[in-house]
């Protein structure tokens, strides 16, 4: 059975304001010098119905006063004993500390909770097996700069200097910039390189920049050492390689601020295929044409991918001045991709220029351009078809192919290479105007008729059939049967209808038999 005191101490109650001091003593809810104390929710206490504190804040206060009764009450309310110890350390209430000493397994656990350096050091001193070196390590870890300042002379002692490097690395790993700055200004750091390595791994640009300040300013001001230009560039180039490999553009720019060479940055960006860095440096630093070509040679040597080569070529508008040097690299390193890109680009540029000529210039200027760049008539005609320039097409056809039959044969071949329907029909119309303008041999007309059928050129085919019937009559039987077969296979109903009409004429004239018709298209002409 619980006592009233146990119930009040273990549970959350609102105490009546008229409880006497004697009653509060009996309940164990009186804090000497403060008044009543009661638990509020899970993590707070209310003192004398007025002051609200967290349980751990109250433990620090009780520890400072050495009030074990209140400490026990607050621990009952799930407070953290460490805070009572911290409070006791502040005011050196070692009696209270001795009371709970056995419950603390490792005094280092308390250190992150302590804000002031004196208490921090007192707490660390309770770890009897630890020495000054351990204290300094924890001072770095928990940002207690004043402790380092206090023991500066010890750190400068010849016997202790060997530990400076370890403390420096620890400060880097924990990213304690204030401590790093102080160490750079006051201590002889044997090797400052870890600050750069760790800054890159953690992507901490501020710490990376501080590293250069330590090396080039603080350490030189201390007279510790002076970097020769060669050693300085070796270090900076190593940093270039490290940060570009990870694609850290802001770090690259930071290195350039501290003496890094643009060409070196470009070289690493090219060899490691970091196009974002390459593009930014080229554009921001106005890199000259000659340097870009050197980077292009390097890219060829390293077999850089297409995107990197294209990017470099774009800076010089795909115009390589030192072609001989480029070809030397291509042959020496068996890296031909750049040549393919240049040839492709030349083709694209020629196509674009020719298109502009077709749209805006006379035939004579177009012809001159074609001759200068050895452009085939087929390429010109395809572009002219796309731009619907029938006059230009007729002009070049007459200029190149004097024989109308040859003209039609070549245009028919071009029709077969055009992939879009409107382009094919446009060129077929031009072919038909040539047919109408000249007298072709019968065999050429027959070939043209089958060509029209294959491309479903209904109107032109009908016109041609009329001519054939009027001029050749029943001699066209074989052609009509062939056209019927093609139209049937390709399912061109309009063509089939036209052919059927002329087959009817042939049948009526006795030039064709029912069996011949049935062999070609039995179902359609079963009536015969």
From Swiss-Prot:
Highest rank taxon of the organism: Viruses
Keyword Repeat included in the entry's annotation: yes
Keyword Repeat in annotation: yes
ANK repeat extents: 129-158, 261-290, 292-322
Subcellular location: Host cytoplasm
Induction pattern: Expressed in the early phase of the viral replicative cycle.
An individual GO BP term: symbiont-mediated suppression of host type I interferon-mediated signaling pathway
GO cellular component terms, semicolon-separated: host cell cytoplasm
Key words of the record: ANK repeat, Host cytoplasm, Host-virus interaction, Inhibition of host innate immune response by virus, Inhibition of host interferon signaling pathway by virus, Inhibition of host JAK1 by virus, Interferon antiviral system evasion, Repeat, Viral immunoevasion
Protein family: Belongs to the asfivirus MGF 505 family.
Assembly and oligomerization: Interacts with host STING1. Interacts with host JAK1; this interaction leads to JAK1 degradation. Interacts with host JAK2; this interaction leads to JAK2 degradation. Interacts with host RELA; this interaction inhibits NF-kappa-B promoter activity.
Job of this protein: Plays a role in virus cell tropism, and may be required for efficient virus replication in macrophages. Interferes with host NF-kappa-B promoter activity mediated by TLR8. Mechanistically, inhibits the phosphorylation and subsequent nuclear translocation of host NF-kappa-B RELA subunit downstream of TLR8. Promotes the expression of the autophagy-related protein host ULK1 to degrade host STING and inhibit the interferon response. Also inhibits JAK1- and JAK2-mediated signaling and thus negatively regulates the IFN-gamma signaling.
Stated name of the protein: Protein MGF 505-7R
Protein species of origin: African swine fever virus (isolate Warthog/Namibia/Wart80/1980)
